[in-house]
Amino acid sequence: MASHDLITPNGGTLVNRMVKGADADALRAEAASLPTITLSDKQACDLEMIAIGAFSPLTGFVGPEDFRSICTSMRTADGTPWPIPITLAVEDEVKATLEVGGRAAMVHSDGTLMGVIDIESLYEHDTALELPSVFRTEDEAHPGVQAVLEEGHWLVGGPIHVLTVTPEHEPGEQFTEHRLAPADTRAAFAERGWKTVAAFQTRNPIHRAHEYLCKCSQEICDGLLIHPLVGETKPGDIPADVRMQCYETIIEHYFVADRTMLTVMPAAMRYAGPREAVLHALVRQNYGVTHFIVGRDHAGVGDYYGTYDAQNIFDEFEDGEIGVTPLKFEHAAWSNKAQGMVSSKTFPKIQGDQIFLSGTKVRELLDEGQRPPAEFSRPEVADVLIEWATAEAAATA
């Protein structure tokens, strides 16, 4: 089986904006004399996602036409499905050094030169359009809204040319062994003979409800891609290295190895709920995935979105417009009566019988120094979590 037999990337072509060899040497030399844009952690995540093709069909940060079209219609100006504008925001003093038709060097906050952008547009950041469209709220308490409001007032649009995506400022967060680009996962799926692949997105350790959804999807697909997000998340989320240890542990003990893959997605969380669910699905399509698990309040935060808004939003697209198939799962819970995971579709509701699980509840238990019970987490995963929580508590005592 060849990788070209897999699902077509969003927009039809898998983008690659990495520059190698002599071209890279020339770009580094040129960058030394260019104005500089220092990237935030979120922007560095976006740069990587564009460069490796995960954000295909984007070849760079969006210009004003795409920005407006994405905000109003969840499609780029040419009609390709895309729900969230990927922007490069700068402050006034940086904007003053830039000009349309020129170029700028993009550097990480640690000083690493990451690439160069061709400046095709400089335009005002219309947060009055973006916030209610993308986040369905302008509440500054929403972490995604807050992140946008803290960005610069000007947006730089244009294609990018990327030299590196993994500066060495946080080597423990890079997970090189599991950091596969879309071209790599597609090759791996083809080598394994997987024609249908389900992906599970997570920013939390996998608890029993997650495991249930994953295994339901494995019954209908050739393989499962556990694809945790390891880019920028909000304060309070369990660190990526701890989560990765949890994923490796549960796969080792409770999943079939030759039907399961673990790779990381280096994207930043936006907490945009329904629109981010569509983004996550399209990104997984670029990775070669055919089915995407969408559970309760996917990519949500607080009470900003309805329980199944992230599932219903897919109905706003025409049949076939989005290549990947959303797997819309009901809220799963542990049933004492059934002694296993159930949903409203699989088991009758009995008063006081079901224990509903969430990553937030697991974190609350850990903060209180309590071990997550077997109904919440597999014991091997609970061991990892309680060891981390104990060490963290000791460090802050």
Regions found by a protein language model. Name each.
Residues 1-397:
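Active-site cores that bind ATP or allylic diphosphates and position pyrophosphate for catalysis
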